[in-house]
């Protein structure tokens, strides 16, 4: 007769349970060893008793390497297979979010341009009006500031041009003053030369004309007509020479 079929359920007797655990554990470890030797397989076995005691078997020298290999083969493939699906799902959610924002911005732009205002209620219209007023004030403020900046630049250029004009005017006045000074000095020098050399020339001319009356030297009797001519000549030269008569002719 063979052994009867054992019902698989928890053994209630504590002693029998411990005996059965020890027998089956040893048999399991033996089967794992036989499998690794007969089939050249990498086998690792980990068993914990109900009290938390550890029993293990590993066909290799390091249990951790076998566990790392098991983790890569099991959980790594799951992560690799699930990664594209998760990325696709996240990308689709991001797409839906961006699409909603894009449609909202398009609707706001049309409302700002005065289009599609029918679906808006009174509160939304008031909010749109306040938004437009704020935008208009900001535009006017920026425009005013731009005009003030331009005015300031033009005033600065005006001051620069006025300073340059003033400098050129002063330079022109200095040049005109120097020119008048040189012209006045030239006229005064010419008058002094005329005054200095005018009278001696007249005197010398009178002297030469008086000597031309009778160039010959005579001793004794002189012709009376020649004396009269000399007197007339001396009188004419004295009138031309401003009344100057040499002393030897008197």
UniProtKB/Swiss-Prot annotation:
The keyword Coiled coil applies. Residues 88-178 form the K-box domain. Heterodimer with AGAMOUS capable of binding to CArG-box sequences. Interacts with TT16/AGL32. GO terms for biological process: cell differentiation; plant ovule development; positive regulation of transcription by RNA polymerase II. Pfam families: K-box, SRF-TF. One of its GO terms (cellular component) is nucleus. Disruption phenotype: Triple mutations in the SEP1, SEP2 and SEP3 genes result in the replacement of the stamens and petals by sepals and of the carpels by a new mutant flower with sepaloid organs. Gene3D superfamilies: Transcription factor, MADS-box. Residues 85-150 form a coiled coil. It is found in: Nucleus. It comes from the Eukaryota. GO terms for molecular function: DNA-binding transcription factor activity; protein dimerization activity; RNA polymerase II transcription regulatory region sequence-specific DNA binding. The keyword ATP-binding does not apply. PROSITE patterns: K_BOX (PS51297), MADS_BOX_1 (PS00350), MADS_BOX_2 (PS50066). This is Developmental protein SEPALLATA 2. Residues 3-57 form the MADS-box domain. Transmembrane segments: none annotated. Keywords: Activator, Coiled coil, Developmental protein, Differentiation, DNA-binding, Flowering, Nucleus, Transcription, Transcription regulation. Probable transcription factor. Functions with SEPALLATA1/AGL2 and SEPALLATA3/AGL9 to ensure proper development of petals, stamens and carpels and to prevent the indeterminate growth of the flower meristem. Forms a heterodimer via the K-box domain with AG, that could be involved in genes regulation during floral meristem development. CDD domains: MADS_MEF2_like. InterPro entries: MADS-box/MEF2_TF, MEF2-like_N, TF_Kbox, TF_MADSbox, TF_MADSbox_sf.
